[in-house]
């Protein structure tokens, strides 16, 4: 009680009562402390006794083996973690079965219902009893097989795991089975389909080849897992993403995903042998992404591969020795620096398996971080092929992870290659253009445009009347520069009346520098025009040295004059006289072996002598088949585009593939190949049985030309088709048997000796590219349906239009060759060649092809297939240049 001594004394008058109070307080405190200590000691003793008893009880428990049912359920929980895991296992089984069509139907994110159907090899009846048992597979027999495993599955756990956490049904049929069989499974064993039935054996039923697996009530016997996966929307999104990934990696397989009861699929790819990964990516993720994809390939056997879409890979900076040591190949589709999204899309397949690689994903994200804005992400699809001996697939229960030999070095190579390509693409920018023509969205010109024209004409008349009556009338509104149209489709330029420079090497300078003219695509073996190219091969090096077009007429406006083209020195020395008629006549002569010639190959020279006609009136056709074909394209005319082609003004050519034209205040880009093909198709039908003729001064052997065409990769000839000489002989006889029809209706003249005498003149003053003559004859013999009248005429006209159309591919290559010559030879002569070629070509397009567009009946498809694309308007240009 020492602490009481420190307290101040109580101020009280009764000392006895104070002493009694102090004694009472002291006694109470002492009793309370004693009671608390006693209770604490009792609690501690009880806890110690309980823990000791628990330890004694635990030590008495024996180690025992888990039942097989418990083991299977635990294993199933590891393999099948959510519906998307189950679908992944089933998809890989379908692909292992060589399926070409896979259809998936889901309900509630796959928790309530998940069904997958394929057209693969199916399951044999004798295997259906054990198909859902654990560790049963047809893909692995011993552990060493893992080193060379090629299939997706190998453990035999997928169906077993699914059957332990759901109600599983299988309907399957093999190709040699007379019917399909249906069976139900639970916990890896066959089970009766309903409580009323006792037999669990597979039941025969109707079905198609392949397998249909239905999973119902997933995780019905594991409530904890089912409660975790309550978000069915998230589970469905995972399934959609999974289907997209497998669809991209297997473009030849058709993948279909839809919700139960919904007829419209959410994922649908067509598949087929011609389907490519880029096409699938475009259909699933949109064309905005597919246009910006870079195809990157790494192959130790081909360090400089050529990719599709001109995405060529420069492998000079890759160390081939290290690449060979790593022993892997890669093909990837990477978005360029012009594309980014808020969410990253990283898809990785290694030896066909969908796997994750955090290291590779992080490494590539670091590469893209230098080029993309902060907070945006790229699209990456990577397919790695590694020798099975260098990869361990037995790492993760869900097979989502693998281990690769030299993984760090492989990732480093991929990072380096992607960085190289992105640094190149970062220097360019892609701008989208509008394909649909504004104002031409409907078949007819908009009424507002017509009203505007009518109002303009009426206002003009009113103004003129008012001005005559009242000179002091109000002033006309000011016309701003940006609204003024300075071009007129009815006006003509001086160059239309001048003979243009010949673009076919028929001038002295081109003879000196470009090996002369002639059909450079084929070698003249025996020196005769009739056997031009006989037994020879396609000569791509001489592809540009051709007389591919008709020289433009010098006096095109004089209907009575015959026009002779410009000739080279050698041509003037060996000029031959040719009689011209009212038809267009092409004379073919061979060039002599002059010492001045720089090669020993004789080339076929073409000279065109033209007697222009006045406005043609087409001959009335009485054949029903031709009338039907004409009415088909006339009834499908886009009126807006019809006005467009009537009033557009030629601006210039772009790479000879496209031309720039102005219509009103807008600038358009038109596809010359598509439009000229349609033009010559329609002109061929309108000129049916009334063609002029282009004749050769020396007949050409059809057999020899067919042999040349069969040597071309364009022919598609394979060894299984038979010997080329026999094919050429058969096709020659076929064309000879049809010579009366071809001559009477299409002016394709063939004599009894199997020689080509002439071809039709579809458009006045225009001669097609003779490079295509062998292929034209081949297609004419093989692609035409000769048995039926309408199909026969349509097929012939189609091949004629393909023969006469503007071919941009050859012209691009020709300009490339000329540009290369300019780089090595900076003389004025070489520069003039390039000018001559482009100037002559543009003259042909501007003054022969473009006027014919007024006769065109443009189909409606031209409005949205890229044939006509709006580039800009005067208003937009005025904002930039402040003048027009």
UniProtKB/Swiss-Prot annotation:
**Record GO terms (molecular function):** ATP binding; ATP hydrolysis activity; ATP-dependent DNA damage sensor activity; mismatched DNA binding; MutSalpha complex binding
Basic and acidic residues: compositionally biased ranges: 473-489
The UniProt annotation puts the region (Disordered) at 1-21, 297-318, 442-522, 544-605
Q: What Pfam families does the entry give?
A: DNA_mis_repair, HATPase_c_3, Mlh1_C
Give the gene that encodes this protein. Answer: mlh1
Q: Any idea which UniProt keywords this protein has?
A: Cell cycle, DNA damage, DNA repair, Nucleus
**Protein family per UniProt:** Belongs to the DNA mismatch repair MutL/HexB family.
Q: Where is the composition biased (Low complexity)?
A: 446-472, 577-590
Note whether Magnesium occurs among the keywords.
no
Query: Can you name this protein?
Result: DNA mismatch repair protein Mlh1
Report the PANTHER family cross-referenced here.
DNA MISMATCH REPAIR PROTEIN MLH, PMS, MUTL (PTHR10073), DNA MISMATCH REPAIR PROTEIN MLH1 (PTHR10073:SF12)
**Function, as annotated:** Heterodimerizes with pms1 to form MutL alpha, a component of the post-replicative DNA mismatch repair system (MMR). DNA repair is initiated by MutS alpha (msh2-msh6) or MutS beta (msh2-msh3) binding to a dsDNA mismatch, then MutL alpha is recruited to the heteroduplex. Assembly of the MutL-MutS-heteroduplex ternary complex in presence of rfc and pcna is sufficient to activate endonuclease activity of pms1. It introduces single-strand breaks near the mismatch and thus generates new entry points for the exonuclease exo1 to degrade the strand containing the mismatch.
Which organism was this protein described from? Answer: Dictyostelium discoideum (Social amoeba)
């Amino acid at each position: 009680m020492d602490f009481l001594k420190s307290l101040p004394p109580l101020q009280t008058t009764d000392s006895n009562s104070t002493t009694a109070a102090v004694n009472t307080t002291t006694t109470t405190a002492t009793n309370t402390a004693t009671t608390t200590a006693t209770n604490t000691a009792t609690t501690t003793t009880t806890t110690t006794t309980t823990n000791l008893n628990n330890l004694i009880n635990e030590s008495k428990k024996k180690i025992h083996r888990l039942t097989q049912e418990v083991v299977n359920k635990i294993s199933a929980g590891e393999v099948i973690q959510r519906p998307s895991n189950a679908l992944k296992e089933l998809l890989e089984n379908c692909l292992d079965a060589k399926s070409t069509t896979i259809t998936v139907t889901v309900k509630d994110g796959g928790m309530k219902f998940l069904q997958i159907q394929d057209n693969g090899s199916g399951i044999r009846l004798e295997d259906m009893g054990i198909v859902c048992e654990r560790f049963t597979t047809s893909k692995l027999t011993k552990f060493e097989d893992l080193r060379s495993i090629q299939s997706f599955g190998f453990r035999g756990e997928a169906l077993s795991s699914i059957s332990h956490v759901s109600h599983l049904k299988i309907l399957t049929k093999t190709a040699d089975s007379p019917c399909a069989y249906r069976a139900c499974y639970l916990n890896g064993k066959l089970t009766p389909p309903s409580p009323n039935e006792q037999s669990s054996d597979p039941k025969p039923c109707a079905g198609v080849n392949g397998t249909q697996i239905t999973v119902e009530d997933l995780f019905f016997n594991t409530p904890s897992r089912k409660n975790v996966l309550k978000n069915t929307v998230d589970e469905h999104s995972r399934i959609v993403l999974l289907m997209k990934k497998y669809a991209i990696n297997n473009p030849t397989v058709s993948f279909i995903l839809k919700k139960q009861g919904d007829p419209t699929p959410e994922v649908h790819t067509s598949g087929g042998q011609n389907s490519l990964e880029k096409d699938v990516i475009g259909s699933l993720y949109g064309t905005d992404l597919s246009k910006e994809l870079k195809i990157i390939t790494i192959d130790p056997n081909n360090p400089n591969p050529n990719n599709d879409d001109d995405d060529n890979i420069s492998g000079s900076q890759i160390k081939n020795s290290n690449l060979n040591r790593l022993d892997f190949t890669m093909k990837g589709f990477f978005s360029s620096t012009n594309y980014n999204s808020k969410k990253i899309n990283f898809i990785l397949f290694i030896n066909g398996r969908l796997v994750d690689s955090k290291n590779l994903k992080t490494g590539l994200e670091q590469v893209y971080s230098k080029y993309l804005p902060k907070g945006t992400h790229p699209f990456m699809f990577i397919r790695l092929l590694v020798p099975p001996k260098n990869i361990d697939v037995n790492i993760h229960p869900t097979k989502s992870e693998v281990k690769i030999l030299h993984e760090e070095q492989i990732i480093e190579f991929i990072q380096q290659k992607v960085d190289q390509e992105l640094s190149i693409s970062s220097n360019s920018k892609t701008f989208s253009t509008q394909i649909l023509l504004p104002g031409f969205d409907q078949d007819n010109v908009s009424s507002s445009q017509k009203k505007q024209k009518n109002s303009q004409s009426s206002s003009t008349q009113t103004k003129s009347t008012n001005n005559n009556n009242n000179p002091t009338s109000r002033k006309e509104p000011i016309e701003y520069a940006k609204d003024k149209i300075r071009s007129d489709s009815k006006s003509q330029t001086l160059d239309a009346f001048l003979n243009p420079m010949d673009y076919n090497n028929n001038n002295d300078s081109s003879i000196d520098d470009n090996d002369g003219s002639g059909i450079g695509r084929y070698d003249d073996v025996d020196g005769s025009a009739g056997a031009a190219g006989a037994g020879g091969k396609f000569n791509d090096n001489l592809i540009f040295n051709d007389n591919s077009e008709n020289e433009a007429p010098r006096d095109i406006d004089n209907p009575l004059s015959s026009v002779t083209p410009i000739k080279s020195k050698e041509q003037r020395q060996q000029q031959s006289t040719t009689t011209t008629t009212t038809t267009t006549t092409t004379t073919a002569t061979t060039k002599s072996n002059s010492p001045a010639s720089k090669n020993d190959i004789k080339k076929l020279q073409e000279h065109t002598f033209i007697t222009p006609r006045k406005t043609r009136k087409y001959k009335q056709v009485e054949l029903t088949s031709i009338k039907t074909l004409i009415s088909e394209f006339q009834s499908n005319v886009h009126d807006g585009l019809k006005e467009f082609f009537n009033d557009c003004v030629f601006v210039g050519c772009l790479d000879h593939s496209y031309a720039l034209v102005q219509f009103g205040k807008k600038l358009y880009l038109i596809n010359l190949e598509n439009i000229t093909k349609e033009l010559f198709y329609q002109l061929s039908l309108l000129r049916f049985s009334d063609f002029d003729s282009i004749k050769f001064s020396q007949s050409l052997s059809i057999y020899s030309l067919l042999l040349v065409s069969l040597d071309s990769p364009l022919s598609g000839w394979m060894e299984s088709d038979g010997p080329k000489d026999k094919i050429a002989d058969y096709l020659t006889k076929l064309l000879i048997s049809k010579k009366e029809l071809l001559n009477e209706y299409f002016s394709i003249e063939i004599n009894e000796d199997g020689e080509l005498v002439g071809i039709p003149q579809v458009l006045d003053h225009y001669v097609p590219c003779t490079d295509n003559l062998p292929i034209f004859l081949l297609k004419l013999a093989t692609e035409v349906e000769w048995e039926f009248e309408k199909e026969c005429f349509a097929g012939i006209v189609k091949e004629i239009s393909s023969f006469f159309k503007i071919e941009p591919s050859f012209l691009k290559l020709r300009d490339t060759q000329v540009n290369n010559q300019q780089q090595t030879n900076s003389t004025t002569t070489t520069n003039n060649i390039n000018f001559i070629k482009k100037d002559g070509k543009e003259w042909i397009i501007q003054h022969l092809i473009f006027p014919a567009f007024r006769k065109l009946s443009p189909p409606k498809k031209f409005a949205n297939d890229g044939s006509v694309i709006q580039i800009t308007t005067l208003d937009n240009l005025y904002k930039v240049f402040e003048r027009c």
